[in-house]
Amino acid sequence: MLRLGASVGVHQGSRILFSDFADGGQMWTGNGPREYRLDVTFPEPFTRTPAVTVGLSMWDMDHKTNSRMDIGAENITPQGFQIVFKTWGDTRIARVRADWLAIGSVRDDEDWEIE
């Protein structure tokens, strides 16, 4: 975790969501609404729910069909979140990689708890 001052931290990562061309998966062979979800767990939890942003860093698709996609973060907690990728219609997607960034409050080294 990168710490930005005493109580703000950042986690970031990059994940291949799927490679459906290789195995004939639904994003490549399907039609209509399709969705893929990937659980991401932070290496160290935040103290409160962080702000999370997700973007595409690689998108390999069929040039013969329309390009349609929606990507975002859902079910965000201090421990992690889900990357959600959606497409619809005749879109055929071979592979997708997503990059993400989470920023939020973290414990300070000088914080202490009374039990």
Curated annotation (Swiss-Prot):
Signal peptide: none
Source superkingdom: Bacteria
Cellular-component GO terms for this entry: cell surface; phagocytic vesicle; protein complex involved in cell adhesion
Disulfide bonds, paired cysteine numbers: none
One of the protein's GO biological processes: cell-cell adhesion
UniProt xrefs under Pfam families: H_lectin
GO MF assignments: N-acetylgalactosamine binding; oligosaccharide binding; polysaccharide binding
Record-linked Gene3D superfamilies: 2.60.40.2080
Protein name: ATP synthase subunits region ORF 7
Source organism of this protein record: Fuscovulum blasticum (Rhodobacter blasticus)
